Regions:
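N-terminal secretory signal peptides that target proteins for export/translocation
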Residues: 1-7
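Bacterial N-terminal signal peptides
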Residues: 8-21
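Pepsin/retropepsin-fold aspartyl endopeptidases
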Residues: 23-286
């Protein structure tokens, strides 16, 4: 069955659920008329494609809907001799120092950006899963399309391009989708760059001071991210309530991402195909 959820966009407000028809489900698998490129599935969940920055071709990029801004590794910026200015971003529970830079062009599938502002960081410090890639493509580029498709069975990604990009709305900074925990709604960022369900424990306990868990709590390190793995009953994304394995961690130290309670890795949907419909502001999967 194909399910759909409203896309939250910049406000992270979820208005409700949408359900698509069987015809929509059949359309989701038909990519013959769309620009398509293959990807490599890394670590069972990461979508890695090849692209070009400036005159550097064959670079590896993670496609990550949990990242607002496209990033390149410091070594790529060094090779291009880019001028930079300092900044910082929030990565799950901590601030990470980065630089801003402007690249001459980024080519990925149907996209040719021209001059494009990106973040520059040592990606191995940003995420242990990014140690062997050259960049991370965020929603600032993925959101330029009308629709974006991931086919995990065929290991291809494809796009339906907007006819008039000049009149299109700005790309969303993140998706926030509804998630019910023991009767209370929370909002999670949908993240193709994460493999599980991550919840900010203090934000969750503010809403649920009597939060119930089952079994033993296990401390789990994810690179520099320290989490506690628990089994959480009374969880509902769609359909009946279930018991889910989740990871609890501290929230962002700066209080960033207001109204966001964590991240939902797209692997948790166990989807064969996923469609991000930016025009209709809807997520579909089957």
């Amino acid at each position: 069955m194909l399910h759909a959820m409203l896309l939250a966009g910049r406000t992270a407000l979820v208005l409700g659920f949408l359900f698509t028809s069987l015809a929509d489900a059949q359309d989701l698998g038909n990519s013959a008329a769309r620009p398509t490129m293959p990807f490599q599935l890394v670590s069972g969940f990461l979508v890695v494609v090849k692209g070009q920055v400036g005159d550097l071709d064959g670079l590896k990029f993670i496609l990550d809907t949990g990242t607002s801004y496209t990033m390149i590794d410091r070594k790529v910026a060094d090779r291009l001799r880019l001028r930079r200015r300092p900044g910082k971003i929030t990565n799950f529970d901590r601030d990470v120092p980065i630089d801003w830079a402007e690249i001459p062009n980024l080519r990925l599938g149907p996209f040719q950006t021209g001059a494009f502002r990106v973040l520059v960081a040592k990606l191995g410090e940003y995420s242990r899963f990014a140690e062997n890639v050259d960049g991370i493509i965020g929603l600032d580029l993925l959101g330029r399309s009308k629709k974006f498709f991931i086919d995990y069975e065929k290991q291809t990604v494809s796009w339906e391009l907007a006819e008039d990009r000049a009149g299109a709305p700005p790309s969303p900074t993140y998706f926030a989708i509804p998630f019910i925990v023991q009767g209370y709604p929370v909002r999670l960022i949908l993240d193709t760059g994460f493999q599980g369900i991550l919840l900010y424990k203090e934000r969750l306990r503010q809403r649920l001071p009597n939060l119930r868990t089952e079994g033993e709590e296990i401390e789990v390190g994810m690179g520099r991210l320290q989490t506690t793995q628990v089994k959480l009953p009374g969880v509902c994304l769609f359909g009946p309530e279930t018991v889910a394995t989740v990871f609890l961690t501290d929230g962002p130290v700066t209080g960033d991402l207001p109204g966001v309670d964590g991240y939902l890795g797209i692997a948790s949907l166990k989807a064969k195909r996923v469609e991000f419909d930016f025009a209709a502001r809807v997520l579909r999967w089957q």
